[in-house]
Design a protein with these regions (language model features):
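N-terminal low-complexity, Pro/Thr/Ser-rich intrinsically disordered segments
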Residues: 29-49
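A short acidic-to-branched-hydrophobic micro-motif
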Residues: 78-105, 147-152
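Amphipathic alpha-helical segments
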Residues: 49-65
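Sec-dependent bacterial lipoprotein signal peptides
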Residues: 1-17
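Bacterial lipoprotein signal-peptidase II cleavage site
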Residues: 19-30
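Extracellularly exposed regions in secreted/surface proteins, prominently low-complexity, repeat-rich
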Residues: 135, 142-173
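Surface-exposed patches in mature extracellular/periplasmic domains of secreted proteins
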Residues: 65-74
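Short Gly/Thr-rich strand-loop-strand
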Residues: 4, 104-138
């Protein structure tokens, strides 16, 4: 389990422990800790994940029509870009790109290897395809310390389209 997974487990444990009805209050100087002493700081700033793929590249590779990118950031998980159908109608995103800068190239490769999917050759330093939870498709890739996940649950987006976009994206890292 990686540091972010331990953090999530620690938060859940802390929340459940808070339901125990104890009247004691924690020391105001006590710092929260994660299991095994892991400290998870904020994700290193990757910048805007939407800079990695243009809307026209996503549209061309997926053949789902015009898309509109929307950027967001999570302090623990990095930068996201969600490409949605420009015409509306479907609430299902066409593609989501998550990008984060890990503390080292080895850490980024380890994140890719955790996906367990088949290796994709010629894409970044390390890349794997997967079907997370059996829903949709994803490509996990690393180049240097950058770790990127391209994923889609849209019915018209193929694994081949994600792999093509991953190759384009890796060339920009």
């Amino acid at each position: 389990m990686d540091a972010r997974g331990w953090l999530a487990a620690g938060v859940l444990t802390g929340a459940l422990a808070g339901c125990g009805g104890s009247t004691s209050t924690p020391s105001p100087t006590a710092a929260p800790s994660t299991p095994q002493g892991l400290v998870v700081g904020p994700a290193r700033d990757f910048g805007d994940a939407c800079r990695l793929l243009t809307a026209s590249e996503v549209q061309s590779a997926t053949s789902v029509g015009p898309v509109t990118p929307g950027s967001s950031k999570d302090p623990q998980l990095g930068s996201y870009c969600t490409y949605r159908p420009a015409a509306g109608g479907s609430s299902v995103p066409v593609l989501t790109v998550q990008a984060v800068t890990e503390y080292s190239a080895a850490a980024a490769r380890a994140m890719v290897d955790q996906s367990g999917g088949p290796t994709l050759s010629g894409v970044g330093d390390d890349a794997r395809a997967a079907k997370p939870g059996g829903l949709g498709s994803a490509v996990y890739l690393s180049k240097g310390a950058s770790y990127v996940v391209l994923s889609s649950i849209h019915k018209d987006v193929t694994e081949q389209a994600l792999e093509k976009l991953a190759g384009t994206l890796a060339g920009r890292l």
